[in-house]
């Protein structure tokens, strides 16, 4: 009895909730401004690419 009422409650909550739909609405960042998106992606991927080079430089200069 209790399980059925809990199941009915959770399905009604899910049914009543509404999320924005459309391209880019389910992402954790905004895709509205293409230049800001370009800058953020460049920083994100550029830092991952540059990190090994900076680590090697640091190790070579360390003595």
From Swiss-Prot:
Organism: Rattus norvegicus
The keyword Oxidoreductase belongs to this UniProt entry's keyword annotation: no
InterPro entries in UniProt: COX7C/Cox8, COX7C/Cox8_sf
Pfam families for the chain: COX7C (PF02935)
Record membrane topology: Single-pass membrane protein
Transmembrane segments: 34-60
Description of how the protein assembles with itself and partners: Component of the cytochrome c oxidase (complex IV, CIV), a multisubunit enzyme composed of 14 subunits. The complex is composed of a catalytic core of 3 subunits MT-CO1, MT-CO2 and MT-CO3, encoded in the mitochondrial DNA, and 11 supernumerary subunits COX4I, COX5A, COX5B, COX6A, COX6B, COX6C, COX7A, COX7B, COX7C, COX8 and NDUFA4, which are encoded in the nuclear genome.
Primary role: Component of the cytochrome c oxidase, the last enzyme in the mitochondrial electron transport chain which drives oxidative phosphorylation. The respiratory chain contains 3 multisubunit complexes succinate dehydrogenase (complex II, CII), ubiquinol-cytochrome c oxidoreductase (cytochrome b-c1 complex, complex III, CIII) and cytochrome c oxidase (complex IV, CIV), that cooperate to transfer electrons derived from NADH and succinate to molecular oxygen, creating an electrochemical gradient over the inner membrane that drives transmembrane transport and the ATP synthase.
Record gene name: Cox7c
Highest taxon in the source lineage: Eukaryota
Chief location bin: mitochondrion
GO biological process, one term: mitochondrial electron transport, cytochrome c to oxygen
Residues with N6-succinyllysine modification: 25
Gene Ontology cellular component terms for the protein in this record: mitochondrial inner membrane; mitochondrial membrane; respiratory chain complex IV
Subcellular compartments: Mitochondrion inner membrane
Protein's name according to its UniProt entry: Cytochrome c oxidase subunit 7C, mitochondrial
Homology family: Belongs to the cytochrome c oxidase VIIc family.
Regions of this protein lying in the Mitochondrial intermembrane compartment: 61-63
Residues in the Mitochondrial matrix compartment per record: 17-33
List of residues that carry N6-acetyllysine: 25
Keywords, ordered alphabetically: Acetylation, Membrane, Mitochondrion, Mitochondrion inner membrane, Transit peptide, Transmembrane, Transmembrane helix
Pathway the protein acts in: Energy metabolism; oxidative phosphorylation
KW Mitochondrion (keyword) present: yes
């Amino acid at each position: 009895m209790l399980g059925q009422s809990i199941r009915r409650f959770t399905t009604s909550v899910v049914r009543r909730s509404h999320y924005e739909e459309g391209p880019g609405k389910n992402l954790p960042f905004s895709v509205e401004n293409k230049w800001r998106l370009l800058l953020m992606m460049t920083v994100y991927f550029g830092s991952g690419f540059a990190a090994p080079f900076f680590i090697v430089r640091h190790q070579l200069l360390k003595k």
